[in-house]
């Protein structure tokens, strides 16, 4: 379950944190937020991760969006980690295209996330203190991770929507070469109900 609150300038949600929109002229919008990031993994997920500790952290983020044309929007988010878990920076650049197909709204997104070396190491690296017989020390350096997603929603009544999404993430060679990464890509599916009060 997830709860969110949205007004003209302020939004609060588990996924995006606390955001304040301080500019919006209908074409360009600019907002600042404090965004939570769940721990990338737990050591209990795999024997390959035994002894490796990662925690939830928070970013200060500047979000900019630009409505390029009807249904086409560009988004840029630039973030800096605030909780000193890794002191890393990141950015996310994407294009969103809204297309109605047989009356069903479909949103296609293509983008890329950039992580500086500190952030990439927190997600995919192995520190000297984490070396074991199963893994060697590894620092991926800064990295760029392309992604694609397809999302849709369907109104059930005036308050309730059914939503679904498919997400694909692609890992570059400096991530794939990490001893704790076993795949070149990942995929996820989300299906749920959204209720508006």
Give names to the regions the model predicted.
Residues 1, 26, 54-60, 87-91, ...:
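Residues that define the transmembrane beta-barrel architecture of outer-membrane proteins
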Residues 1-34:
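Glycine/small-residue-rich interface belts in oligomeric ring/scaffold proteins
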Residues 3, 14, 30-32, 64, ...:
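Membrane-embedded beta-strand positions of outer-membrane beta-barrel proteins
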Residues 8-11, 40-44, 55, 69-77, ...:
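Flexible, solvent-exposed coil segments and beta strand-coil junctions
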Residues 9-12, 28, 70-74, 103-106, ...:
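Repeated loop/turn-to-beta-strand initiation elements of outer-membrane beta-barrel proteins
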Residues 10-19, 45-49, 72-82, 96:
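Transmembrane beta-strand segments that form the barrel wall of outer-membrane beta-barrel proteins
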Residues 54-86:
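Internal, conserved structured core segments that host functional sites
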Residues 82-163, 167-175, 180-182, 195-197:
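Outer-membrane beta-barrel transmembrane domain signature
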């Amino acid at each position: 379950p997830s709860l969110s609150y949205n007004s003209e300038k302020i939004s609060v949600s588990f996924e995006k944190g606390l955001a304040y929109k301080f500019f919006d002229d209908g074409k360009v919008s600019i907002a600042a937020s404090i965004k939570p990031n769940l721990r990338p993994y737990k050591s209990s997920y795999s024997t390959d991760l035994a002894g490796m500790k990662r925690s939830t952290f928070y970013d200060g983020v500047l979000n900019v969006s630009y409505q390029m044309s009807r249904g086409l929007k560009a988004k840029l988010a630039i973030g800096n980690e605030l909780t000193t878990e890794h002191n890393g920076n990141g950015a996310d650049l994407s294009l969103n295209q809204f297309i109605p197909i047989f009356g069903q709204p479909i949103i296609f997104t293509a983008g890329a996330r950039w992580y500086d070396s500190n952030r990439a190491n927190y997600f995919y690296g192995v520190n000297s203190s984490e070396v074991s017989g199963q893994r060697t020390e590894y620092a991926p350096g800064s990295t760029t991770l392309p992604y694609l997603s397809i999302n849709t929603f369907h109104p059930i009544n005036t308050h309730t929507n059914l939503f679904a999404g498919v997400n694909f993430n692609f890992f570059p060679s400096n991530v794939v070469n990490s001893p704790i990464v076993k795949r070149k890509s990942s995929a996820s599916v989300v299906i749920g109900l959204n209720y508006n009060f």
